[in-house]
Structure formats: C-alpha cells, structure tokens
Amino acid sequence: MKEIQAIYVDLKKLRNIGIMAHIDAGKTTTTERILFYTGRKHNIGSVDDGTATMDWMVQEKERGITIVSAATTCMWKDHRINIIDTPGHVDFTIEVERALRVLDGAVAVFDAAAGVEPQSETVWRQADKYNVPRIAFMNKMDKLGADFEMAVQTMVDRLKANPIPVQMPMGAEDSFEGVIDLIEMKAIRWLNENGTEMVYEEIPEKYRAKAEEMREDLLEKVAELDDEIMMLYLEGEEISNDLIKKALRKATIENKATPVFCGSAKMNRGVQPLLDGILEYLPSPLDMPPVRGWNQNGEEVQIKPSEDEPFTALAFKIQADPYVGKLTFFRVYSGRLEKGSYVYNSTKGKKERISRLIFMHADKREDVEYVRAGDIVAAIGLKDTKTGDTLCDEKRPVILEKMEFPEPVISIAIEPETKNDQDKLSKALTLLSDEDPSFRAYVDHETGETIISGMGELHLEIIVDRLKREFNTKVRVGQPQVAYRETIQEPAEAEGKYIRQSGGRGQYGHVIMRFEPIDLSKTFEFEDRIVGGVIPKEYIPAVEEGVREAAQSGVLAGYPMVGIKAILLDGSYHEVDSSEMAFKIAASMAFKEAVKKAKPILLEPIMRVEVTTPEEYMGNIIADLNSRRAHVETLESRGHLRIIKALVPLSEMFGYATDLRSLSQGRATYTMVLERYAKVPDKLAEKIISK
C-alpha cells in the first residue's frame, strides 16, 4: 500500500475532481479502475457483484447506485488526485451540488451507446452553475450500440457544450480494440486482461484516414480558441503538440471546451490515458480564481490558495460514522491546520477543537498530522459544525458563500415499533438531518406523529433503510404524503393587538400590517416601513419572527404558507408593558386575520417528469400520464427511443416506478425533479381541506 501521508505535493500538482454521470453510465466502475491503476486498491471491485470501494454503504452495494459522496485520495505520476464521488440518481442532486462547490474540475462519464441522458443534463447544468471545468469520458465503448461520434454530438445538441475529442476509438462493440491519441497520433493497445500493460504503436492502416480527419477537426477547434494557434494554422505552419495541449488546457479551465476521451472501464481499457487527461487539462487549486468571502463588516475578501494565508475552509459534508460518531468533510481554501488545534466556526460564532484529521480512502482511513490549502479532508471532533459552515482562523474571521438547499417535496409519517426504539429514533433523525440538509424530520404537534420529508420516494426509502440498519431502530412507515403549501391571491391589511393586564407587568403589542402575494419561488419577504419610532427598532425582529412562525401553519389545511410579503406599516407600543413576546403574538394575530381576507389557496408540487421508452410502449405511457393530470410538453426521438417530457402533480406520481415497469415490461425509465408549485384544482382542494 503506497503511503500517501509523506507525499504533500506542490499545489500545482494537486487535482480536486468529481466524477459525474447518469445513473448507469459506469461512473463507479470508472472510479474503481482509477483507484486500481493508481495503486490504492489491489483487487478490481465491480458494481455488479457489490464490491466497489466507493459505494461503501450497504444500501449502495445492494442497489448498485452511488448515494454518499465519499472522498478518496490517490497518486498518479507524482500528482495527488482527490476524488469526490457524486451520486447519479436524481433524488440525490443535493449531494452533487455540495460536491461541485468544493471541486476544481470534473470528469463527466457518458454511456457511449446512449450519449447524454436526462440526469447527465441535470448534473451538467449544476456544474455550469458553479463554473466547474470538465473533461468527458465516453465509457462502455464495448457495449452493443456504442457510437462515439453520435455520443459526442449529443453533448452539442443537449448540453450546448463544445466537445473536442482528443482520442477516437479503434472499433466499437465486440470489435473495440483500443484508442487513438489524436494529439500524439499514436494507437494505444492494452495487452492483458486487467489492463496494466499497454503499448503505444503506429496507427493501423484501416483507421489512419479517420484519425487524420479527426485530428484536423481538433486543430480547427483549438485554433478557434487560441490566437497563436490560429496564426500558425492559417499559415500552414507546424503546430507542436505541447502548444495544442497548453491551449486546450486554458480553454478547458475557462469552460470554453471539453476534451473528450473514450474507453471501457469495465474492460480495463482507456483509464490510464484518462488519468493523464485529468493532470493535463483539469485545474489545480492555483488555476482557480480566488474564493470570495465576507468579513465581519460585510466587506468582500479574496481568499487565495496559499499555505501562508490565514486558515479558511468550507464544511461540505457531515457523515454519521458508526465508529467515531461524526465525520466532518471540509475543503481547505487557504492556510494550514494541525490536528489537535482549534478552529473558529464563523457561521455559528463558536470555537471548536479538531481531535483528528483523516484522509479518506472510501471506507478506509489514514490519520494525518496537518492539512493545508487545497486539501480535502475529514475531521473528527467538530460537534456544532453543519454542512455549509465556514471554518477559519479566529484572527481573520470570514464567511464563505452560503450553500442553498432545496425544500423537500414528499413526506411520510413514521413511528417506532417499541418504546425502546423511541429514544433511538430521535437521536438517529438528528444525526441524519445533520448529514443531509435536504432531509427534514419533525413532530406534528396536532397528531403527535413523527414526519420525515425529503426529495423523493427513493430518498426516504434509503433513510428508513438506514434507520433500521445503521441505527438498529425498527419503525413502521405510513403512506407517502405530498408536501402541499398555501398562499394568498390578493393583498390584505389587518391589525393585531395583544394586550394583557393581570397584576404587575402587563403585555402590550400593536401592529398594522399589509400582506401581498409574491413569486412562489420565494417563501417569505419582510419589509419594515415604520417611521418616527412608533414601534422601537428592538421589537421589529419579533414582528418578523411572529409572522414567520404563524406562516408555518396556513388557514386552509395547516400547510406552510409561501409567496407572501409582509409589510409592517404602523402600530404602537407601551413604555413598560411592551415586550418581544407581545409583538410576536400581535404580528401572528394580524397575519391570521389578513390571510383569511386575502383569498387563500392550496398549492401542490408540480414535477418535471422525463420518461425514456422504446417506441412501442409510448402510446400506453402517454395515456397513463394523461390520467395523472399530466401536461405533456414535448416528444423527442433518440434512436429507437422516445423521450416524453411532461409536467405532473407529485400527488399523482406515487408508485409510478412500479406502474411504469409493468407498462413497459421494465424497459422504460424516468427522472423527476421539482419544477414549481401551482394551484390545486378546486374539487381536489376541497377534499384535501376536509381531511
């Protein structure tokens, strides 16, 4: 086992990358092979038989999909590569967003027979949002239907990307025999089954013309991105390979191009050149712009990737660990941190001590003495730190940009089977919601039930599974419930007056407020229009708090209210009797009064559903979607497959996975993400409200 500890590499030799893909594109296998060839792992794991290193949670081993982004470190040609494994299933896009925040670059893995699939589009858009430079790997070149040029074209058509193949395959499907490097103009062949022996040789005659044509394409595309190459190209001068690589690296880091590689990870072909590509084209922390942060005065500060700067890091993942309690994963942006020292959590305003620092290798771990700028590391000992918190040096407190997390759309009631399970359940739910900000757990005060909510049925299934397995807590599970919301349609004003006089000090709070509908994507806004101090400044936050709390339970059916702007217009106070509590109660009275007059309505989550199906099942699937109140937007053809894009209310989608399987004999697949909230039809709303 090569010891990583001693090898603190120079920053320019560090790569922090993610491997992102659609659920079946072979991402885990690609990661596995990377670990194998970089000497971190002595037997080749396979998803199909459940031995893959990165998929280390039991549930992942059974389902064959990656759920938790484990961070792994490995060495290749005296560079250190930190890999963050990201899930490909749409219910876990939160994990993907989180990983993308702390990466410098990514490898996008595609299935060469399918090209860009729906989830690849989602993940690609998220990577665009965080400006993550990417290279692409067309995997599964040995699969039936593999077509390199078609797959590359889908990157243009569906992702609006600028793919530049730096390799082409020799053959495809059964006859896939290796790859051609279009920059060096050499063929690469693998001599043994596990792919450890490879040779560079002359390009076979039958591929020569195609390779020359594709190299010409490559030169043309690179010339468009680089003035120096453009000049040489137009003058017909020789363009050196180093110059091509340099220009391509610059374009990749600026997100103007995506170099494309190909191979078959499962057949152990193409992985070492992909590793070279990670070093060649993806950025080191030094190539990235400085990270932005804000100091205590709210002024922007630039955080430079240097060991000499004060320490700054972002916690991007909390993982409950059966052995050590809680692991906090963070990315160090500047400075250096020794184990046993204190860090300042500027988000919470608290000091915490780090007892151990660990480099993770999927589910094995190595203790290290210190970490520094660029590192991705797990720490033990941080009790109060949550996902998205900034850790820094107390002498230079700074807050990095906050992470934003989506609201859950689906809930189920769960109850412990025995009294003994009750205590275990509340502890486990606390740990799980620390770990995953898109998962919520709370007790419904009216019914006394424990409600858990998340991003989809699979998300909650996995949570329930973990409760049983990891936390040994037996629970009974109710039917999934839709997370409805309520809102108002018209502006309304109301007065809230709370006065109590009962011996000694009284209570006095008085507000006049206006409530207006705003865009439903915004939960709540508050505006203070008080002039002349008719309500003193110190009570204003209590007014906002009162409205926020009241908005948690709407007037129609007790669902949280969204899309409301609260404006505090006027009011009065009493020198002695006024208190924060009195203003909080007065504000909630005004809110409840106004909402009744503002034409409240019930809202439901509308999901963007994309079904991919062989043509022969399309008619039945569309008929079924229509029976679910769907609005079918578009139909697309992709080879022999049809893609149906529709908007469907979530309440109609329960159990859809099973129904779709029976409609298509298991051949159709679908993805579903929240699009927006919309008004529930009146008849249905009456039913929901009467419940």
Swiss-Prot record:
Top-level taxon of origin: Bacteria
Subcellular location: Cytoplasm
Keywords annotated in UniProt: Cytoplasm, Elongation factor, GTP-binding, Nucleotide-binding, Protein biosynthesis
Positions that bind GTP: 21-28, 85-89, 139-142
A single GO cellular-component term on record: cytoplasm
Predominant localisation class: cytoplasm
GO annotation (BP), single: ribosome disassembly
GO molecular function per UniProt: GTP binding; GTPase activity; translation elongation factor activity
Pfam families: EFG_C, EFG_III, EFG_IV, GTP_EFTU, GTP_EFTU_D2
Residue ranges constituting the tr-type G domain according to the UniProt record: 12-286
InterPro entries in the record: EFG_II, EFG_III, EFG_III/V, EFG_IV, EFG_V, EFG_V-like, EFTu-like_2, G_TR_CS
Record PROSITE patterns: G_TR_1, G_TR_2
Physiological role: Catalyzes the GTP-dependent ribosomal translocation step during translation elongation. During this step, the ribosome changes from the pre-translocational (PRE) to the post-translocational (POST) state as the newly formed A-site-bound peptidyl-tRNA and P-site-bound deacylated tRNA move to the P and E sites, respectively. Catalyzes the coordinated movement of the two tRNA molecules, the mRNA and conformational changes in the ribosome.
Matching PANTHER family: RIBOSOME-RELEASING FACTOR 2, MITOCHONDRIAL, TRANSLATION ELONGATION FACTOR G-RELATED
Homology family: Belongs to the TRAFAC class translation factor GTPase superfamily. Classic translation factor GTPase family. EF-G/EF-2 subfamily.
Listed name of the protein: Elongation factor G
